[in-house]
Amino acid sequence: MLGLRTCFSPAFYLAVVLSEIKKKVRLIQGIASTYPEEITDVEEGDVCTVFSFPRFYKETVNIAHFMRRRGAKVIIITGKDIRPVKPYGDIIIPCSAVGPSFKDSYVAVHFLIDYIISSIAAKNKDEGIEVVSKIEEILSQNYFIGF
C-alpha cells in the first residue's frame, strides 16, 4: 500500500485490515524518505494499491511508476479527475465525495476500502483463518489488560 501525506490514512487502514486476512501485506511508509529501501524487492506478480488525491504528490507517482516498471500491478485509487495519475497505474479507480470543506471527504474511499477487504476476505477464507489464528496467538501473550 502506498499513500503519502494526506493519503497515508486510507493506505494505512487498508494495510492494517488487509494484513489480518492476507500474508505479505506491506505499507510503504517512507519515514525519513526511505522509499528506495522499502521497495527494493518489488517484483513481477506483486500488487500495489496507491492512494493519490489532489494535490497530487509527485513522489507518489514516481514510486508507482518504479513499481510498475519492475512488473508489479499498480491500482490507483484517486479522485474524479484521473488524468494526472492515469499513466502510472494498471487500474485506476475514481472515488470521490465532495465535502463541505476545501478538501474532498474520504468517506467514499473508506467505503471502497471496506468493500475491497470484504471481497478479498470472501475469496481467501482459508488464508484469512490462518493469519487471524497467528495474530490471536501473538495477542494472547499478555497484550491486553483484564482479558
Task: Give a label for each model feature.
Residues 126-147:
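A short, charged, Gly/Pro-tolerant segment at domain boundaries
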